Amino acid sequence: MQTVAEMIPDYKQNLDALRARRRELIAERELESRFERRHALTVRIIRLDGIIASTTAALHDMIAYAD
């Protein structure tokens, strides 16, 4: 079992990957001409925004706890 301090790098790496995926989806949405596909991409982006926000908050708390 990992300590909180040991988990922080993994959370940071996952957060970077989530942000990169969000950028990819935004770029894909900008090029998409079909409304239905743009809408589906927007829904995915909104879901990712929530995941990114909760992961960021968790990471902040983990860093504070580890100090």
Predicted regions: what is each one?
Residues 1-20:
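Short, charge/polar-rich alpha-helical segments
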Residues 44-67:
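Amphipathic alpha-helical coiled-coil segments
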Residues 8, 12, 30, 50, ...:
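N-terminal regions of proteins, emphasizing targeting and processing segments when present
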